[in-house]
C-alpha cells in the first residue's frame, strides 16, 4: 500500500487530524518523532477512532515497534478513551501525571467526564495501566528528542503541558479564541491554578501553543492577558460555585441587613 506524505506542523511534529485534513477524533493527537522514527503520541482521542489513527501512523511509515509511549495531557475521556486499545496494539507504555493515573487505571467514568447523567452522556472508559508517572520538571525522551514536562493544573488537577524547543503542547489551558478548558469543581478544576498556569505560559519564551482542541497558534500575550482578566472575575462570581473564592454580593447583603435597607 502506498505511503502517505508526512505533513508536519513543525519539524518532528505531526498532528493527525491535520494530517488527515479533517477531524478524526475528539482532540488533537500529536505525534512527536526523531530522525530515527522513534515516536510518541500526546493523547489519542476516542476509542472508535483508534484503528483509523493507527492506520494513518502506519501509512506515514512509523513502525509500531518504535512507539516509545502514549502520553496523557490529562485524564478526560475525549483525550484518553482509546489508550487501552492503542496500548494493546502498540505494546507500549502509558505516561501521565500522578493525579491522572488513578482515573486512567480505574476507568473512573465520573472523573473522566465519561458519565454526565444530567446530559444523558454515558460513554465507556476502558481502564488502562499506567507505567510512567511524570511531574513538573521531568523529561520524556523520544529517541533523540526530549520533552520538558510542565504541570499546568486548572482545567484538571493533573493536567500537563510539554515543551519541545519553542513549542508548548498546551493541553486545555488556552485555545485560539481565548476560551479555556471547562471549569468544574467535580472535575478537579481550580480557577486560581488556571490563572497561575496561564501566567507561567505568558512569562515563558515559547513561541507556539499547540492546544488539545482547535488550531495551533502563535503565543499572544494580549490574548493571555485578556483570558487571565476574565478568569479573575470568575473568582468572585456565583456562576462558578465552589470554584469561586467569594461572592461580594453576600457581603453587600450582610451590610444591608444590618442597615435595615429596604428594596429600591
Task: Give the residues covered by each predicted segment.
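Divalent metal-coordination and catalytic microenvironments
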Residues: 12, 32, 43, 53, ...
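Active-site HxH/HxHxD metal-binding segment of metal-dependent hydrolases
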Residues: 46-51, 58-139, 229, 233-237
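Conserved beta-strand hairpin/beta-sheet module of binuclear metal-dependent hydrolase folds
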Residues: 4-60, 161-171
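Residue-level marker for buried hydrophobic side chains located in beta-strands
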Residues: 40-42, 71, 94, 169-170, ...
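C-terminal regulatory/interaction regions
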Residues: 240-264
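Short Pro/Gly-enriched beta-strand edge/turn motifs at strand-loop
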Residues: 9-17, 117-122, 144
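Metallo-beta-lactamase
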Residues: 46-48, 139, 146-226, 230-237
Amino acid at each position: 500500500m502506498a505511503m502517505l506524505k508526512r505533513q508536519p506542523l513543525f519539524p518532528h511534529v505531526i498532528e493527525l487530524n491535520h494530517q488527515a485534513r479533517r477531524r478524526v477524533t475528539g482532540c488533537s493527537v500529536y505525534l512527536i518523532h526523531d530522525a530515527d522514527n522513534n515516536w510518541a503520541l500526546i493523547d489519542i482521542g476516542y476509542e472508535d477512532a483508534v484503528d483509523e489513527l493507527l492506520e494513518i501512523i502506519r501509512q506515514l511509515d512509523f513502525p509500531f515497534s518504535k512507539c516509545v509511549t502514549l502520553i496523557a495531557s490529562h485524564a478526560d475521556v475525549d483525550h484518553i478513551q482509546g489508550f487501552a486499545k492503542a496500548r494493546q496494539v502498540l505494546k507500549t507504555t502509558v505516561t501521565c501525571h500522578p493525579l491522572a493515573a488513578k482515573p486512567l487505571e480505574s476507568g473512573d467514568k465520573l472523573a473522566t467526564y465519561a458519565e454526565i447523567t444530567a446530559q444523558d452522556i454515558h460513554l465507556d472508559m476502558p481502564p488502562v495501566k499506567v507505567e510512567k508517572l511524570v511531574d513538573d520538571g521531568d523529561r520524556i525522551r523520544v529517541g533523540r528528542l526530549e520533552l520538558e514536562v510542565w504541570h499546568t493544573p486548572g482545567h484538571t488537577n493533573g493536567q500537563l503541558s510539554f515543551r519541545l524547543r519553542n513549542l508548548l503542547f498546551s493541553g486545555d489551558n488556552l485555545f485560539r479564541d481565548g476560551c479555556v478548558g471547562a471549569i468544574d469543581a467535580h472535575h478537579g478544576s481550580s480557577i486560581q491554578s488556571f490563572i497561575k498556569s496561564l501566567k507561567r505560559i505568558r512569562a515563558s519564551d515559547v513561541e507556539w501553543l499547540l492546544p488539545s482542541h482547535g488550531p495551533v497558534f502563535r503565543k499572544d500575550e494580549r490574548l493571555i492577558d485578556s483570558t487571565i482578566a476574565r478568569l479573575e472575575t470568575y473568582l468572585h462570581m456565583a456562576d462558578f460555585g465552589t470554584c469561586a473564592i467569594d461572592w461580594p454580593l453576600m457581603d453587600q447583603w450582610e451590610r444591608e441587613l444590618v442597615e435595615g435597607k429596604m428594596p429600591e
